[in-house]
Amino acid sequence: MKLRSECLPKSEHGTVLYTLSQLPDFPPCKDQDYSHEDLLQTAETFLKSRIKEGDVQANFLLGQLFFEEGWYEDALLQFEKVKDEDNQALYQAGVMYYDGLGTQEDHRKGVKYMERIVTSDCPSAKHLKYAAAYNLGRAYFEGYGIPHSDKEAERWWLFAADNGNPKASLKAQSVLGMYYSSPPNVDLQKAFLWHSEACGNGSLESQGALGVMYLYGNGIKKNVQAAIECLKEAAERGNVYAQGHLVSCYYQRKLYTKAVELAKKIVSHDNIELLVNTTDCLPSYTVKGVAIATFYFARCLHLGLGIKQDSTAAKQLYSKAAQLDAQVAAELNFDIIYGKI
């Protein structure tokens, strides 16, 4: 299970660029055709003038502006300048070192920066502690920058999840659901509990996972109607894993036209990384969702269900599903052999 870093807790005002543009002393727009690039240039000039005046936070804001634009090398340079005075800069630099954004991966340094935040007594670090604790749990789970330990990962994630506190780490709450669903730590009742907490707090990942748990009766009594409701809502919000299982549900209920229509949309995605970044769902589960949809689309083409029969296209899609996720394709092949699909 490849995890992703917890993002910096977001300002309620949105992006740095938008926040800056609303400040009373931000230079006004003189041209009605003010482009995004023009606004960026104005914001950069504005922040650099603040930096010259000794405004430490302006360094962080400039770094965050660069970070949000994907200019990672420039962002890291700004964060490093003020990491000892600004905990948000320290946090972002830690994420960048761990994930290798704008620099070579340095997991140990990333871990060190997160440890500084969770042990800090500074009031400005308080809102970052849950996110930093999630990232430490991730490091222990992956064994990068620190010795692998499932128990330490679990401990940090439980701290970060804070009993389902909506203001705690949403990623920690969701990943605990995944953690308790996977060997050797399987406890499906705990998994259902944590996915429920995370879903209630807005987790798209956990909403899809809950739908699957209801669908198969994992950790909770099987409830197909509740499963479909969860999967539909998650699918509409962009959860590809939920979309794949929704295709499966449509197929099983003989709603072949619906299955084909949804599967076509999913199979047309040719940029998995973009899907992952857009939804912030785990890469492995996003790929599984595409693989499931691809296999069922192949099955419909193979048998002419909800679409004109096309054995050649079906063969290509069966192969594509196996390339995406061999385990998913193998399990669905067994379902064909045993007459389940």
Swiss-Prot record:
Record-linked Pfam families: Sel1
First-listed, main subcellular location of the protein, grouped into a coarse class: cytoplasm
Keyword Cytoplasm included in the entry's annotation: yes
Gene Ontology cellular-component terms listed: cytoplasm
Residue windows of the TPR repeats: 56-89
Sel1-like repeat start-end pairs: 90-122, 130-165, 170-203, 204-239, 240-271, 291-326
Gene3D superfamilies: Tetratricopeptide repeat domain (1.25.40.10)
SMART domains listed in its UniProt record: SEL1
Compartment(s): Cytoplasm
Xref: InterPro entries: LRP2-binding (IPR052323), Sel1-like (IPR006597), TPR-like_helical_dom_sf (IPR011990)
Protein keywords: Cytoplasm, Repeat, TPR repeat
UniProt keyword Repeat present: yes
Domain of life: Eukaryota
Function statement: May act as an adapter that regulates LRP2 function.
Name the record gives this protein: LRP2-binding protein
